[in-house]
Curated annotation (Swiss-Prot):
GO (cellular component) term, any one: nucleus
Protein name: Patulin cluster transcription factor patL
DNA-binding region: 38-64
Induction summary: Expression is correlated with the production of patulin. Expression is positively regulated by the secondary metabolism regulator laeA. Expression is strongly decreased with increased sucrose concentrations. This decrease is lost in the presence of malic acid. Expression is increased with pH changes from 2.5 to 3.5 in the presence of a limiting concentration of sucrose, 50 mM. Natural phenols present in apple fruits such as chlorogenic acid or the flavonoid epicatechin modulate patulin biosynthesis.
Localization terms from the record: Nucleus
Function statement: Transcription factor that regulates the expression of the gene cluster that mediates the biosynthesis of patulin, an acetate-derived tetraketide mycotoxin produced by several fungal species that shows antimicrobial properties against several bacteria.
Keyword NAD included in the entry's annotation: no
Ranges in coiled-coil conformation: none
Compositionally biased region (Polar residues): 199-208, 687-705
Pfam families: Fungal_trans, Zn_clus
Molecular function in Gene Ontology: DNA-binding transcription factor activity, RNA polymerase II-specific; RNA polymerase II cis-regulatory region sequence-specific DNA binding; zinc ion binding
UniProt-listed GO biological process terms: DNA-templated transcription; positive regulation of patulin biosynthetic process; positive regulation of transcription from RNA polymerase II promoter by galactose
Keyword DNA-binding among UniProt keywords: yes
Amino acid sequence: MYSTFSANFDTTIDASRDRSATPVTAPRPKRNQVARACDWCRLNRVRCDDKQPCQNCQNRGGSCSNTKPQEATSLPAANREMQRLRNKVKDLQDQIAKLKEGAEIQAQTGFATPPLSDAAHTSFDFAELTNTTEGWQGLQQTGQIHYGPLSSSYFVSRISRYLSQALNEPIEDAKLEACMARFHYIAPSHQPSRWDASPASQADQPQDGTEEAEDLTRSQEEHFLNLLWQSFHCVYPILDEREFQQYYESLWSSSPDGMSTRKPSALVDVLLAVCMQYSSTFFVSDDNQQGDTDSEWQAKHANLASRTYYQRAQRLLQSELENPTIMVVQSHIYSIVYLYNTSLLNTAHINLGATLRIAHALRLHIRPLDGTSPEQQELQRRIWWALYRIDSQLSMTLGRPPLIQLSHVSCGLPGDDREHARLSGTVLLTNHEDISWLSFHVQCTKLIFLVQGVQTAFNRKCSQLLNGDKVKDLYEDPRLLETLAEFLGQEMTAIHNWVQNVPQSLCNPRKGGSDPFSTNRDALNLSAYSPLWLQRQRLLLELHYHHLVISTLRPFIRFPPVSSSMTPLTDGYNISCLNHAMAITSILNQVLSETDLLRGWSPIFQYQWDAILCTLGFVLANSVCPPTPSARKSLQTAIRTLDLVSDHFLAAKNAAQVVREVSCQADRLVKNVQQGLTRRQAPRASQALSTRAQNPRQASNQTSFVAPAQPGVRSNSLKRALPPTTLEVSQHQPMPNFEARMQLMDMMPIGSLSELSPSLGTTESMSMPSVTSADMVIGTEAQWLHASAMILDSWTTNS
């Protein structure tokens, strides 16, 4: 044992000596470790790495389990995964914050955010430059100004075509106009002034002293400007009243000849033009039966002077285009208001395009810079969103694309609380805590934004259904129109929400206790104790709402309506559109008869005219229909309303006469229906009586409806006049088919039709139809039509 131990000991010593003699090498580097090797590397017991896929799997060209999402199997791995998710959430929150900052109006209204522009995409597809997909363009003719299918002009063209075909008259004889002011249109002419751009331009003008507008004294100008602050300023709050008063004072104090003349100012001139145009309606006396009275001469002189001041302002603005200021934008906005009140809509739309470019140059569409005073920030916001309101209103009226794209806008909505009202520079006090004088502007902006979104979605849906076919018309396919009606019902929810959220102090109370913005035509409870500006804002907001709904639902009126029961939603929208039109007529008739709140307010005349066109269209398309008598009564009320304003709005008198003439044409269509029934009444009645005499038992076992006649015998005029309805099948008695009801109409007396569609000649004939005659003509469909109207309008009447 000792020998063995000694031998091993010697060997150990020798080995240690050998190791000490050899040089010491560096320790091997520690290999990189991974939390978990991939499945292939772990199976083959080879090193793996953190790459995805790992290097081994990438070299062999196989799949690697590292590319799949890994679950955290240890605490460090879980911490790393949590940190990665935190970073991702932070990035997403930053993106959301940028979107909210760029489109604050979407967050406040809750409507869908408009799509981003193509410039935001990183990849470009040049196929989009040759995209020929178009939506519903309607029936257009070359060489004419384009008006979209949702515009009043296009609706007038549809009515004119239908009357031409139904009465076999040339379409050139149609007397309807899309704009009521065109019934008394006077082309503007140039009026020379000492403030023209150059002396040479003055020499070219006719030197007629009667056409030269006299310069007003300071007291006369202030007399007109005082009308501004409780009228247009409450609707378009784009001025700071304190700043304007200081600016106006400087124009007189710094004039060359002291205080006798004022320095040239485009803003003051255009404000004087708008106020003179507005005040021209106040010169008319009560007794104007003796021709051209002194008051009428004063009104014409005021209109002429307003036109002169407008033209002078435009010449002054031309010299300021290269270096514009906020005041230039304000001047252009009131120029557009002047043109809109004169019903020069195309001119106003073109002027708006230049105004928006000036606003872009002044960066009004972008969030105000830091360091700008709160007063100026709010003023810039109010100016920009006033431009947005005007752009949307003109674009929807003319049926053209809007000029403002909200994807490029980062200017938030202005405030409307008491603090923002204090910053505005205007003192208009009210006892209501939930509103200020700026609330009307904010609510109008939200409403127009929502309606424009609904109409944009409607056009997009039309484009999808038509697939770019420019020739195909929506009215050729009733099922396609019904699909659009179903789609529109979903989009109208946003407008319903707006109605529910309007501040109560901005709503008009009703005498019958019904809800504001309803269509039941209850009389308004006009409060004499509310401020004048607040009463006017309430009326204009509700009228504006009804007018926008009319423009949205108007395309569903068809000429002539289909005689099948395929389109219940479309038919319901016809009645709903009629209800909103009659609501406008009822409100305007009451307000203009009892008060002077809207006297001289030109836009309301266009609201009334669009309501008349909608009502006329419904009567022409549905000569025999339960709501038709109410529609014809509403036409009589509208004529009386036009007569009320004809003393100071000359076009109203001619427009009322045109309504009477078109109503007579509607009577002719009803007479055609009656004549068609007269020709078929006697032979079919005798045939039915002989049939019952031959088969008394069979007749007694059947219902009271006679057997259907041949389809080809039906009168075309009757088929055109009957309304589109649905069939309600009773659980206790089988519903007769369409042919059976047509034969029943042939058996009924002709006098019942006059009850359903009375003549417009006298007011006494406007009595509501009896239940018996309505049920005889339309059966249970009358109940459906009334129910549809209540269902579709329930979102405006229920709180």
